[in-house]
Design a protein with these regions (language model features):
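Short connector loops/turns at beta-strand edges and beta->alpha or beta->beta junctions
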Residues: 39-44, 69-73, 195
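Histidine-anchored nucleotide/phosphate-binding helix
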Residues: 56-70
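Conserved phosphate/anionic-ligand binding catalytic regions in large, soluble enzymes, centered on
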Residues: 4-25, 116-128, 132-134
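Hydrophobic alpha-helical positions that pack around
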Residues: 88-206
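Conserved alpha/beta core surface patches that mediate binding of polyanionic ligands
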Residues: 7, 12-30, 50-56, 170-175
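Short amphipathic, charge-patterned alpha-helical segments
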Residues: 63-65, 207-212
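Iron-sulfur (Fe-S) cluster-binding modules
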Residues: 1-6, 73-78, 107
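Glycine-rich phosphate/pyrophosphate-binding loop regions near the starts of catalytic domains
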Residues: 31-59
Length: 212
């Protein structure tokens, strides 16, 4: 947790809440605790999660399991975009291998398909959808770290956030925090498309401007 706090890693789904602090909040709550991953990627023109999941899925799975281990989550729910059947099929195959080798003995992993609703990018809307309800935002407080999925304390991350967890633990908090511009820390991934010379997924320092 301290390593995550020192790294400056924040939630990369839009809210930007400090990752280490979120882990600490969830871990302080009563058990059982849960975890939810938002892989719905419903924002127009965004495809960075698909890029990472198809090119380095193990890095995503390792980061997810590390986070689940830290907060002692009994179950992880992966909320995946329905338009990504290739990703879902491949991840299920890899998770089966994990289970066969007893690499996730303390954590059960579940898949749920999103319906592509943009609103479910908001964390509490995703929780409602996971529970089989209409994906509408909840009133806060209480926050998901206190009362989340099925009424249990829940750690919520998006794909890109957990993607950096393993890298930070391998290279250290200083490595990640040494990147960044204009008062920001870390690295960010951008989906570049449209009438540009070099479309695709681009990695750049946090805080970089369009001109730069």
């Amino acid at each position: 947790i301290e390593e995550m706090e020192q790294s400056g890693l924040r939630g990369l789904g839009g809210a930007g809440f400090p990752t280490g602090r979120k882990w600490r909040f969830v871990r302080a709550e009563d058990k059982p605790r849960l975890m939810a991953i938002n892989g719905d990627e419903g924002e127009p023109g965004t495809f960075k999660d698909h890029h990472y999941l198809t090119r380095d899925p193990h890095r995503f799975l390792e980061g997810m399991l590390i986070a689940a281990w830290v907060v002692e989550a009994t179950d992880v729910y992966i909320y995946m975009r329905d338009e990504y059947p290739d990703v879902i099929k491949f991840l299920k195959k890899e998770i089966k291998i994990l289970e066969e080798n007893n690499l996730n003995v303390k954590t059960r992993i579940h898949f749920r398909r999103g319906a592509g609703a943009y609103i479910c990018g908001e964390e509490s809307s995703m929780l409602e959808s996971l529970e089989g309800k209409r994906g509408l935002p909840r009133h806060k407080p209480p926050f998901p770290s206190q009362v989340g999925l099925f009424g249990r304390p829940t750690l919520i991350h998006n794909v890109e956030t957990v993607f950096w967890v393993r890298e930070i633990l391998e290279k250290g908090a200083v490595w990640f925090s040494s990147h960044g511009l204009n008062g920001r820390k870390g690295l960010r991934t951008f989906s570049v498309s449209g009438r540009v010379k070099n479309p695709g997924v681009k990695l750049a320092p946090a805080g970089i401007t369009i001109k730069q």
